[in-house]
Amino acid sequence: MLDFFTIFSKGGLVLWCFQGVSDSCTGPVNALIRSVLLQERGGNNSFTHEALTLKYKLDNQFELVFVVGFQKILTLTYVDKLIDDVHRLFRDKYRTEIQQQSALSLLNGTFDFQNDFLRLLREAEESSKIRAPTTMKKFEDSEKAKKPVRSMIETRGEKTKEKAKNNKKRGAKKEGSDGTLATSKTAPAEKSGLSAGPENGELSKEELIRRKREEFIQKHGKGLDKSSKSTKSDTPKEKGKKAPRVWELGGCANKEVLDYSTPTTNGTPEAALSEDINLIRGTGPGGQLQDLDCSSSDDEGATQNTKPSATKGTLGGMFGMLKGLVGSKSLSREDMESVLDKMRDHLIAKNVAADIAVQLCESVANKLEGKVMGTFSTVTSTVKQALQESLVQILQPQRRVDMLRDIMDAQRRQRPYVVTFCGVNGVGKSTNLAKISFWLLENGFSVLIAACDTFRAGAVEQLRTHTRRLTALHPPEKHGGRTMVQLFEKGYGKDAAGIAMEAIAFARNQGFDVVLVDTAGRMQDNAPLMTALAKLITVNTPDLVLFVGEALVGNEAVDQLVKFNRALADHSMAQTPRLIDGIVLTKFDTIDDKVGAAISMTYITSKPIVFVGTGQTYCDLRSLNAKAVVAALMKA
């Protein structure tokens, strides 16, 4: 039983609707529009919303959307046939009204489609009932029944052939092991000569061995060296004392060499950092987050130089290109198949996950199928333009994270703004936490760093080093004696959730604006550590949960994000589990134009990329520019 069936235009006008079991179809259809149609995720024609399964079909020629909804616990095999039949009949019946494509004509039009729909629904249900059951194949008709007889016939003939081949190979191996270089005709004679001692005698054997040795040396050319080595090895070596190895920093070094403690000047470690402040800070405005720029001046100059030649080529070869024009033609899947295959391979080469590349190309095919092209548009340009629009739309997800605005809102409520960083091992969580701390300090917010990585050795010391250097960049003297950055740590082996709770309470009492919680790196399959992370997030309810991921990963990004979200949902004790809110993409300066990880991560989670790490100084932090990333992704 269907819950509803609705037909509406891409402009939002509902042309016709059938209400079955469900009272209203507004909520599920709006969720479909927000999550699938507007986000360019049309690779799969089904969508699940709460207890309903929605299937849809796009008519790109007339800009129509056909949606059917039913309970997801039901298995209705006739839904695909029904939606195709309704699409075909509705388009043919009201072609004149739809071709006007004006909102006023669609509003004034009367689409009496109830009786036709009920007839198609009844036919679809009956066809599914009377569908012929699949009959089991007989054993006599299968390949397995024919295989034993054929294999017996083949193996009898093959055994003799294999025996002959094996005998030949064994004979060749024996001849090779003896080192004979003579032909097959003379070989038996030589063997007989070797065996016949009375005819040849001992001298003949020596001559034969010497002759074979010379032939072997001439053939391989390395026997002389080996023989010389063997003669050298026969001579006994004079035993001498081994020279003692002198280590650069050995035990005999003096105390000055072994002293690794930081030099103290007037008892302040900040004075030792004064000469390295510019190196630590980096160049650029720290308080202003710049957009990511993936293009270079060389690429721009190349594109500018190629534009005139391209225009000349199109004008000069106009008549030769007329065969490739598809003006005033509706696109079909056969037309786009070869282009989409090239686009899919291009995306995979640019580090997009393989499954996501397939879904993107399928979404573009559904979007363009049946669409009438322009006069001088080719299939390649149309598909490429549609793919670029889809990629830009994916990188601009539903929610936009504005940390500065949210921190000011938390200040008005007199509470600290809490951010939790999570991710796998070695992706740069602590480093990018320090970059974000510097960015917040440059904007005038005080930061408390909570060292909740009680698992990895050296994690607390790493954060202590960052805190000391950030304090040197923003000393209390510049802020009226107020401590702008401080580390809250309780050592190793403690409960991370308890440390985070104490840090938030300490920040509230001391008046800190932001609390940045550093967590231990963990693999997505490590159940105990994922349970501890879910406990930390559930107990402390942070304002923002950021997943830190590398820009180097491809298919692994999909597995990491899916399993992190699944683990947070499974191990959470709350009724509505808290999932990942945003993404921090690190090591973006090491991938050139292979920026596909940004597409993979955003497509999987529908969450925005909040920050992008582009270097090793505190200023190397950027915000994502969707158009620049897509331009780098589509660059050949």
Curated annotation (Swiss-Prot):
GO terms for biological process: intracellular protein transport; SRP-dependent cotranslational protein targeting to membrane, signal sequence recognition. The modification Phosphoserine is found at residues 177, 295-297. The modification Phosphothreonine is found at residues 283, 303, 576. CDD domains: SR_alpha_SRX (cd14826), SRalpha_C (cd17876). It comes from the Eukaryota. Gene3D superfamilies: 3.30.450.60, P-loop containing nucleotide triphosphate hydrolases, Signal recognition particle SRP54, nucleotide-binding domain. SUPFAM superfamilies: Domain of the SRP/SRP receptor G-proteins, P-loop containing nucleoside triphosphate hydrolases, SNARE-like. The NG domain, also named G domain, is a special guanosine triphosphatase (GTPase) domain, which forms a guanosine 5'-triphosphate (GTP)-dependent complex with a homologous NG domain in the signal recognition particle (SRP) complex subunit SRP54. The two NG domains undergo cooperative rearrangements upon their assembly, which culminate in the reciprocal activation of the GTPase activity of one another. GTPase induced rearrangement of SR drives SRP-mediated cotranslational protein translocation into the ER. Belongs to the GTP-binding SRP family. Component of the SRP (signal recognition particle) receptor. Ensures, in conjunction with the signal recognition particle, the correct targeting of the nascent secretory proteins to the endoplasmic reticulum membrane system. Forms a guanosine 5'-triphosphate (GTP)-dependent complex with the SRP subunit SRP54. SRP receptor compaction and GTPase rearrangement drive SRP-mediated cotranslational protein translocation into the ER. This is Signal recognition particle receptor subunit alpha.
